[in-house]
Amino acid sequence: MPSRNSNVLQRPTYAQLASTSVKSSKGLVSYQDWVVDVKASISAISVNKSRTKVGVAGRELLKVLAVNPNSSKPPVCISDLLQKSTQTKHISCNDVKWGSSFASNLIFTCSPLGNLNVWDVNLEALLYDFNEHSRAVHKLDISSFHPSYVLTASQDGLIKLWDYKESSSTITFRGNSEAARDVVFSPSEPNEFVAAYDSGILQKWDIRFPKLPFLKLAAHNGVVLCVNYSPNGVFLASCGRDKTIRIWDSTSNKKKSLITINNVSPLNCVRWRPANQQSRGSNQLASSSLVGDTAINVWDITRPYIPYRTVSCHDSIVSTMHWASTELLWSCSKDGIFSQTRVENAFNCIDMLPRATSSWSTKNSLVFSSNPISNQRLSSLNRVASFESNISSLKSALYASQNSDGSTSNPVPFVPHNFVGIPQELGILAYRSEDVAQFCYLAKNYRISGDISSACKENAFFARNVGAEFAYQIWDALYFSLGVLNNSDKGISELINIPFVSANNSMADDEKGRNLKNLTQISTSSTPAHDNLSLNDFFEPREASTPSESSNSSIESEDNLDKAVLNKQSQWHDLENPIVLKKGQAPVNNFSTDSRASINSSYLLDSAASNYSGTSHNEMFNSFHRSSVTSASIKSREAVLSAGNSSRRASIFLDQLSLHGDTDSEIPIDDLPPIELPYVVTSIISDCISRGDVQTAACVCSVFSYLTIDLPRIQLDDLLESYVDLLRRFGMFSEATLLINMSGSKNLKYIHSSSRDLIFEMENKKATGNEQSEKGKENAKTVTSLKKCVYCELPLRGVLVYPPVCGHIGHESCLRSWYFDNTDDALPVCPVPGCGVKLLDKRALI
């Protein structure tokens, strides 16, 4: 074997590896005073009572730094206690506390080996080494009333009270719980302390009664990692893995927290901000995250939903913090960075929030808050939120308003405590009572199942009765379209007499007819004299120069009509006057038999033309609407067209007319696509969406759910979901359930289903009854034993799914995404390494 090279370097220590970790190349942030790299991972810091020295402890680290009188300059290392002796060189420290009073020259540390060490800073030596804990000591604390009393919290679940002058511990407190994570003396009660445990329990003890705690608090749903008293001892803050900070009243024995602050990630440290002369910081505290977030959030308990300030100056997880003063915060991270920041100059999260917001009230009114629209008031606000740039669109708008007069101005620096708040206004947008009544009436009476033609007919009747003009036009046009497209083999003379929706022939329910009788009577006083016009009266040759000549001319047959229309230009009567119905007023004239034909014709044409491709088609369709068809008589202009839309042939005829209105068009008649029902329905739903009529669009979508609607599925699902939300908001839960069942949307049914379990079928053959029962037992055991998703490896929560046979469990969203996003041609295999179970082709499940 070749000889070992003697020049090979020795294996580096953890401290050396930590010192070479990758750090950001960026400089200090604007609110950061200084940064010190101690070349090792930092676990804890502690400052002496005179605030002239600070102890820094961590993995193979215990240094003493001298604090510079000028707070803007970094501290300087004056002693490295671990390097003074070979016996203590590789000691690691989980926590450090500086002694007070007669022990002001002593530093107390605890180690992962279960030791309590006492160091003399002046001698730079280890004085005492206590070892009574069987497992690691996580935290320690020193009494401010008895400087020789030290408490230690250990992984073995014990809390021990030490007098460092004695050779062993004085009292042992058994909490009958899991590991003890933190312990802290009360700053106001000399004999009380609080201990935090892995079980989420906080226990308050009196050192005079060591057998049982005098108060137990079910504080968190997971491990409690830190507890901290406010400077005056009134409040107690706790944080843990459940991503919450809880504030407790330490002066009472109440077992309910006063305030709960929710964070986006698990928390490992919380520190109360000291109060200044105006007691500004008495209600504020800082917190840091255990994983996932390197920022420090400063919270004000009077506003627990958004941080007061956010400090982002570390590239690694923040391990500990300490308030050097009311304005200065010291923080340390796992990569060995010790930093000082000025909190008031840090990033203000409130400036990121939009100044306008809205929400539904309990009375179904829309409540909104926004800035008053006043240029004079907005331009008078000359402020920024922090030294961070590009914070919000609001700030950009303010600067733009200030510079609109042509002058240039720089942003004004942030002035702590003196900024001007932007005034806001609150408003309530309530429904009109008639709109709510109309919506509820239609929602309860609309028919979205059964025979399609009857449903459209009845829905048009209901819409007409309550004065819903647009909804009536929609349903009547659909009913007319169904009659046209389903009777294409009949002649025009038969289709002209298709009954339209009226109060006399649309409903079989006599009771509803009697209740709405006053709304269904059609006035005959304003019936025009041209009701009995024939089809021939609507078209005539263009050579007609006078009204009298036009009225006398006619087309004798359908062939002549087709020829006249295809070879000559005509004039189309464009009905665009809105139909307005007053509350309680029956429809007159505009809702007559003739106007109904015009409504149908309009939607048939729009649906036909909107689904043709090609620029020339669109241009011809537009020219058709302007004036490109055969000229009509004055009599026909007064009447509302068209009987030609009453048949399949008339629909194709109008379609040909729209495409051949341009004299330059040479599209063969035989190549023209026919009008189909999906085109009409798609056009109508699009029109309803553009008008914001959610109810009509959703009901049309449900009635014609068997059709292939040419709209994105996600848009239709969003439409149906919006209507379901409206129904539930008004308490119509049965109607919402019916809509979900009749919508034909798998996504909507899945979202609102009571059971969302997704079970993957297997390629293996079906197991027998005994095998299935055994597999079911195994799966039940697997559910209770596994605690992580097989795909994302995060704790199992919410809806869980598993493939039968193998029983590997994961989150429904994870496995669904993995299964359906797989683009390989081969059968998907269970994501668990080594499982090898093949699933059925997903195309068979879609």
Curated annotation (Swiss-Prot):
InterPro entries: WD40/YVTN_repeat-like_dom_sf (IPR015943), WD40_repeat_dom_sf (IPR036322), WD40_rpt (IPR001680), WDR24 (IPR037590), WDR59_RTC1-like_RING_Znf (IPR049566)
GO biological process, one term: positive regulation of TORC1 signaling
Keywords: Repeat, WD repeat
Disordered, as annotated region: 541-560
Segments of skewed composition (Low complexity): 544-555
SMART domains according to UniProt: WD40
WD repeats: 88-129, 132-172, 175-215, 219-258, 262-309, 313-348, 624-663
One GO cellular component term noted in the UniProt record for this chain: GATOR2 complex
Protein name: Uncharacterized WD repeat-containing protein C4F8.11
Organism: Schizosaccharomyces pombe (strain 972 / ATCC 24843) (Fission yeast)
